A protein has these predicted regions:
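Short acidic/polar hinge/loop motifs at secondary-structure boundaries
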Residues: 56, 169-197
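A beta-strand signature from Gram-negative outer-membrane beta-barrel systems
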Residues: 86, 185-227
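Gram-negative outer-membrane beta-barrel transporters
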Residues: 395, 448-453, 546-548, 569-648, ...
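Periplasmic-side early beta-strands and strand-to-turn transitions of outer-membrane beta-barrels
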Residues: 71, 247-333
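Extracytoplasmic beta-strand/coil segments of soluble accessory domains associated
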Residues: 129-170
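N-terminal periplasmic "start-of-domain" segments of outer-membrane beta-barrel proteins
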Residues: 42, 46-47, 53-55, 98-124, ...
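Outer-membrane beta-barrel signature, preferentially recognizing the C-terminal barrel domain
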Residues: 226-231, 330-346, 382, 481-486, ...
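Short strand-turn segments of transmembrane beta-barrel domains in outer membranes
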Residues: 216-246, 257, 279-285
Length: 716
């Protein structure tokens, strides 16, 4: 598989050599000749910013450049007509772009390795997990169907080591993984990723990295917008959504409703040794989900406050593994989740003050009391409460015209509560609560010389918990050269931790699994180095990661009056990664990209690295190849993904599952009818109808078809 990646990269480089390019350097000023900083200069595929003196440098092969900054009229100029000076005309600010500060560091100096995932507004994603897995560093082993549980892994780390942050609020700081299917993809505005040991920014569970999700708050201009969409697909799938947005100069309101229903009863091939040349149907697998999301934002000069709330209810049939269908038949999980956030941002002295208050409530009920073969009867109700307050202050200080010092400080306090009520045996009830507090300090020294930008920063964090107190840190450095070839090199070094979840500590709900109250927190230390190059419309990037994890928690089968599963601190694990990315957009209507991730994840607690066994369910190789064709009304896209073999037992003695490849295809068409934007869309998933395995006795779906239409109308 390496050969096609190398061949494609060489082909991209060869063709790009023939492209005509322009190296443009100029200064941006207002009509009074004052320099304008932080202007966004874009050629459609690449973006740069003007520095504090108004200067910018860009290498482009496009015909035009667009200049945009809040408080000024947007300007578009031909590259042949751009001289040494660009004048922007001021205009009153009607609606500033609404941002929610995740933590203090995001106010003044985001990490240099933060990556923004592209979200196609015309593409229809079946879950938030699908949005994230478009990045090769993010992988999911869950069934890729609407309504199914969706957990993700960053750089081969465990899913519980991926911290999900929603509008600044961590959703899984308790050491568990987060189910992304509980987030409505129609309500996602943007996604940012920070990889490799970032507990200093998010706290527990950020060993692998952080995924920061921002929800939609409103339009980028005043007016009203109404949209409705409906979609049908394979396996009894149907989804309907409706949204309304109201924007005024000082008030923004948005509401989104969504309903999903699917049977997910797909046909799969039975293993050859079980029943040769036969198939079966994955039945008893229906999923239903309803969601409501609303947000309100009020603007007052340079400050604003906002409130967001989401409510989601769901019901899932859980058929279990196909070798125990009669034991889990009619089993189900139902429940609801409610998330609320209040955010206030305001200028203070020469900096910015941010306040965030949140309340998250979750409740689920598991019922396995109606199985024909009542071996593992279980019926329990879980409740989770997470509340807290976060305050932050950030300030930018100019030491010299070229040198700036950015400082930020934040503090947080909150409360967690977890209850598990066993409805068959109240003696097995679990009641767990804890308080937490933390503080973060970050400083950044940044030098902007016009032709290059050099940034060095450090952050420290101290967490107070009722289990253990944790100290984490992170060092960051990056150097960006803005010459004919735009080059960026950088690296980070840091530590992280992950608390054992209440489930790991106290579970006692059945005879097959038992919690371990003696578990220790997991700790890690790791580094990463990266280099990226942008030349014309060609983009190349490579990155190297290493992470050592101590006290890694894994569930193992032990002998305790019979076989019992119990979580244990197995010792030490080491995860190494090599990332390679390439992208090329030779014309505005064609976008090509490819990527590869090589992972070496091993349990080194008892062996040296060479002889150590691989960690389970972590593919050693991931490749992707994507193509987009964009015309005025029609868009076509394809997404090919290959995932390598995975070991399924800790000792690696069982033959690993082989690698598999998937191809997804889609199209969107847009047209205006009587003032309405009508957009039919169609998607084919697993277009090659591949049969593959990720977990034993958990079948994966074959080819699936989805299609629908969205209607949208806007009024000024």
């Amino acid at each position: 598989m390496k050969s096609w990646v190398v061949t494609l990269c060489l082909a991209i480089i060869t063709v790009a050599l023939t492209a005509e390019s322009y190296l443009i350097q100029a200064v941006i000023v207002d009509p009074k000749e004052h320099p304008v900083s932080e202007v966004v200069i874009s050629d459609g595929s690449k973006t740069v910013f003007s520095n504090e003196k108004g200067y910018f440098l860009i290498n482009t092969s496009a015909d035009t450049l667009t200049f945009h900054r809040l408080g000024f009229q947007e300007k578009k100029l031909s590259v042949k007509n751009i001289g040494k000076k660009v004048i922007l005309t001021p205009e009153p600010v009607v609606l500033p772009r609404i941002t929610v500060s995740d933590v203090a560091w995001n106010i003044v100096s985001p990490p240099p390795d933060k990556i923004s995932l592209p979200i196609d507004p015309d593409r229809h994603y079946y879950s938030a997990g699908e949005v994230l897995t478009t990045n090769p560093a993010i992988h999911s082993n869950d069934v890729p169907l609407p309504g199914e549980s969706q957990n993700i892994s960053i750089l081969g780390n465990l899913s519980r080591h991926s911290l999900i942050i929603l509008d600044g609020v961590p959703l899984n700081p308790d050491g568990s993984s987060f189910d992304l299917s509980l987030l409505d993809p129609n309500n996602i505005e943007s996604v940012d990723i920070i990889k490799n040991n970032v507990s200093v920014y998010g706290g527990s569970s950020a060993i692998g990295g952080i995924v920061m999700i921002s929800t939609k708050k409103g339009l980028q201009q005043t007016g009203k917008q109404f949209s409705i969409s409906t979609e049908l697909g394979s396996f009894g799938y149907a989804q309907n959504s409706l949204s309304f947005t109201f924007n005024q100069p000082s008030t923004i309101f948005r509401i989104n409703l969504s309903n999903l229903s699917t049977d997910n009863d797909f046909r799969y091939k039975v293993p050859e040794w079980w029943s040769p040349d036969s198939t079966a149907i994955r039945s008893n697998n229906a999923k239903h989900q309803n969601s409501l999301a609303a947000s309100y934002t009020h603007l007052n000069k340079k400050s604003h406050f906002s409130f967001q709330t989401e409510y989601l209810s769901f019901m899932r049939q859980l058929p279990g593994t196909v070798n125990f269908t009669e034991i889990y038949k009619n089993a189900s999980l139902s429940g609801w989740a409610n998330r609320n956030r209040f955010n206030l941002n305001a200028p203070l002295f020469s900096g910015e003050l941010g306040t965030l208050i949140w309340l998250n409530l979750d409740q689920t009920t598991y019922d396995n009391t109606k199985a024909p073969l009542p071996v593992y009867l279980s019926h329990y109700k879980q409740s989770l409460l997470n509340a807290g307050i976060h305050g932050s202050y950030g300030q930018n200080s100019s030491l010299t015209p070229e040198l700036s010092l950015n400082t930020s400080l934040s503090a947080e306090a909150g409360y967690n509560s977890y209850q598990n009520n066993n409805l068959l045996n109240s003696a097995n009830n679990i009641d767990f609560s804890s308080r937490f507090a933390n503080s973060i300090l970050k400083t950044e020294l940044k030098m902007d010389k016009g032709e290059f930008i050099w940034s060095n920063s450090g952050a420290i964090r101290y967490d107070l918990t009722e289990q253990e107190n944790e100290f984490t840190w992170r060092l960051e450095s990056s150097l960006q050269s803005l010459g004919y070839i735009e080059t960026t090199i950088g690296g980070t070094l840091g530590t992280s931790f992950a608390l054992p979840s209440p489930y790991d500590l106290y579970w006692k709900g059945d005879s097959q699994a038992l919690g371990n109250p003696d578990l220790k927190s997991e700790h890690s230390q790791g580094w990463q180095l990266w280099m990226s190059n942008q030349w014309n419309k060609l983009y190349l990037k490579s990155a190297f990661h290493k992470n050592d994890i101590e006290n890694l928690i894994q569930w193992r089968q032990i002998q305790m009056w019979g076989n019992v599963w119990k979580p244990l601190n197995i010792g030490k694990a080491r995860i190494k990664n090599v990332e390679i990315e390439a992208g090329w957009q030779p014309w505005e209507w064609l976008n090509l990209s490819t990527s590869a991730l090589f992972t070496n994840a091993k349990d080194i607690s008892e062996h040296n690295e060479e002889a150590a066994p691989y960690l389970v369910y972590i593919p050693g190789r991931n490749y992707s190849l994507k193509m987009e064709l964009n015309w005025k009304k029609l868009k076509l896209w394809s997404d090919y993904h290959y995932s390598g073999k995975q070991y399924t037992t800790p000792d690696n003695l069982t033959e690993p599952f082989p690698g598999y490849s998937l191809l997804d295809l889609g199209l969107n068409y847009s047209m205006f009818i009587q003032g309405w934007n009508v957009s039919p869309f169609f998607t084919i998933r697993n277009a090659l109808n591949k049969q593959y395995d990720i977990y034993a006795y958990v079948p994966q779906p074959g080819i699936a078809f989805y299609g629908g239409v969205s209607l949208q109308v806007s009024n000024p």
